[in-house]
């Protein structure tokens, strides 16, 4: 009986800890998204890119210019540029200095380095999980601060270093 009471008590403690994490998550304020460039399905009509209601296999950035009332479209290609990027989790303590990088569309890049070198931080900056202190990050020539976060994240493919495979075939794990 003492063994069972101990196991039940342990289950209660684990449940309370899980509940506490859930309530902390529910209390979080939603992240602000001030982006206005969106990702849309598109088609080419002659040399002009137009938005499509159907899935076309082609994506474009839709940029509405408030000042002129004009909407333009730019085909999603996928080049990423870091131009003199500075970042620190605490703005007073910059940990990444003058980062310059260019990734061509479709190019596969691996960030390699020791623990704490900034590999994950760079992928977090591309996803706009954090804002940079200085410099620019551009995606297809567009400052990523102008792109809606959800659309930006939909357009990226990132493979992290920790892979988790489950029982089954490779296809079942995909």
Annotate each PLM feature.
Residues 18, 28, 149, 153:
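ATP/adenylate-binding site constellation spanning eukaryotic-like Ser/Thr protein kinases
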Residues 42-174:
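ABC-type nucleotide-binding domain
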Residues 1-27, 34:
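Cytosolic ends of transmembrane helices, especially the final helix of ABC transmembrane type-1 domains
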